[in-house]
Amino acid sequence: MKIDKTKELSHDMSIVNGKKIKLFALSSNRALAEEISKAANIEISAVDVVRFADGEISVNIEDSVRGHDVFIVQSTSAPANEHLMELLVMSDALKRASAKTITVLMPY
């Protein structure tokens, strides 16, 4: 009997085919991130995005990403500048938190 390892998923839902994976949804396209999460059988990881009165954006990643391949879902829909800055701040936070790779899924 042949086992298809491409669909193998560990019990902790963050390891797919031996790779530690995290999926994050930012504010612009949560619905798409939920569809990806369901199709890939990966939970969306927790992130807290705060916008201060002066326009500054703060991102707090609530899960450890050290050594993980990270995917971020964020589009450039209006307001494009705010969504792009949110993505850049998130990418910086992930890099500083030692994510192995960062891949952005950015639909137009």
Regions found by a protein language model. Name each.
Residues 1-108:
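PRPP-associated nucleotide enzymes
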